[in-house]
Amino acid sequence: MDFLLGNPFSSPVGQRIEKATDGSLQSEDWALNMEICDIINETEEGPKDAFRAVKKRIMGNKNFHEVMLALTVLETCVKNCGHRFHVLVANQDFVENVLVRTILPKNNPPTIVHDKVLNLIQSWADAFRSSPDLTGVVAVYEDLRRKGLEFPMTDLDMLSPIHTPQRTVFNSETPSRQNSVSSNTSQRGDLSQHATPLPTPAVLPGDSPITPTPEQIGKLRSELEMVSGNVRVMSEMLTELVPTQVEPADLELLQELNRTCRAMQQRILELIPRISNEQLTEELLMINDNLNNVFLRHERFERFRTGQTAKASSEAELATDLIDMGPDPAATNNLSSQLAGMNLGSRSVRAGLQSLETSGHLEDDFDMFALTRGSSLADQRKGVKYEAPQTTDGLAGALDARQQSTGAIPATQARIMEDIEQWLSTDVGNSAEEPSGVTSEEFDKFLEERAKAADRLPNLASPSAEGPPRPSPGTAPRRKTQEKDDDMLFAL
């Protein structure tokens, strides 16, 4: 298409744009730039020729100094030219295929060019948002934001209005216009209840443009300074606060500032088309741009804050969905209650301990009996120390001494056992001297002797303190016979 139309730099405005964007220039030629704006506004083909020349200088140019000069010319023309040039620049095709493509990473643009393009797109999107035929740049701007592109912060002191809205002339003869003005007045009254009121200059009869008095101008500027102060405080808070670590009090103050500033912006937008003072209009437009910038920062801040909150809540929901591999508290309590319900009284515990001790004693007795059964009588007698009859009386006495030493029987019972042993030894000695044949008379005599021996037996319940009498020396044969009988008893 450009080939059919010829060289873009052949037209009068194209020639001037070529000179204004020459790479040999050290800085911008503002006189030439303003001359370009005049040609665009005064000629019929000026907007199209200028647009083609600027597009030619930017598109595919690797000399970023020339690109930077062309962007400056383009910005100057947008701010100083009318709607005809805005329609061409705000086209979505131009913004995407020329401006955005220039700052792609493959072209490796310098930071100054990158920030310049993004600043132009952002400022145009804010300025042309309310114009239906200039929303192409708005769509590109919103698309870039959705993709996560961070736009640089604009210098609030260097901002200037892109275009000044035309003065609105109201027709006093139209009733519908009068109704709309009255409705706007009521809306301003409602907003004044929620925000710091801006003074509304007196409306002249016939709803003509407002010409404020010097006193009203001074009051209006004092209110605008208050608005600028709120914007400055809000901007500083957005700079200092961290979205993920904001305190509730700071967040509440920030939200209150946001609501107040939005109400103030609404009042400013209502005053801009009605103020006839050009200087006041420029101040209102500049404050409006500052408000738009701080609102964008607040939206980005809220997006980060709400995003982190949603992430934390999703992690909490994920943690609740995980299977708990630890012990179930209900099962643990149930087990504890079951153990508490078991009969573990002192009686049952004592009975269990006694059964263990009894089984231990039985095992010891069985081991001793097995040892006795497994060894011969001669081996057993080797461990027995035979002393004088006065000390120990036979094997029974030795066993009694062992039991006394182990604490099996008391000392008094040992004395009783000695008396019984003496009685049995006497009977055994008398029966050993008798012949093997026994008649009835001898048996009767034996019974009488046993009866006499029973009379000589001491009282078991109250044994004498002196102890049993010492055996006479004549009892030695009887003791040997007793030992033989004991050997036979153990052999069985």
Swiss-Prot record:
Coiled coil: none annotated. It is found in: Cytoplasm; Endosome membrane; Early endosome membrane. Found in a complex with TOLLIP; interacts (via GAT domain) with TOLLIP (via N-terminus); the interactions leads to TOM1-recruitment to endosomes and inhibition of TOLLIP binding to PtdIns(3)P. Interacts (via GAT domain and the C-terminal part of the VHS domain) with UBC/ubiquitin. Interacts (via clathrin box and C-terminus) with clathrin heavy chain. Interacts with MYO6. Interacts with TAX1BP1; CALCOCO2/NDP52 and OPTN; the interaction is indirect and is mediated by MYO6, which acts as a bridge between TOM1 and the three autophagy receptors. It is a peripheral membrane protein. One of its GO terms (cellular component) is cytoplasm. It comes from the Eukaryota. Disulfide bonds: none annotated. Residues 167-215, 450-492 are annotated as: Disordered. Residues 215-303 form the GAT domain. Residues 392-463 are annotated as: Interaction with MYO6. The modification Phosphothreonine is found at residue 164. This is Target of Myb1 membrane trafficking protein. The GAT domain and the VHS domain are required for the interaction with polyubiquitinated proteins. GO terms for biological process: autophagosome-lysosome fusion; endosomal transport; positive regulation of autophagosome maturation; protein transport; regulation of endosome organization; substrate localization to autophagosome. Ubiquitous. In adult brain, it is highly expressed at the mesencephalic level, in the hippocampal formation and medial lemniscus. In cerebellum, it is highly expressed in Purkinje cells and granular layers. InterPro entries: ENTH_VHS, GAT_dom, GAT_sf, TOM1, VHS_dom. The modification Phosphoserine is found at residues 11, 160, 176, 180, 208, 355, 376, 462. Residues 167-195 have a biased composition (Polar residues). Belongs to the TOM1 family. The keyword DNA damage does not apply. The lineage of its organism: Eukaryota, Metazoa, Chordata, Craniata, Vertebrata.
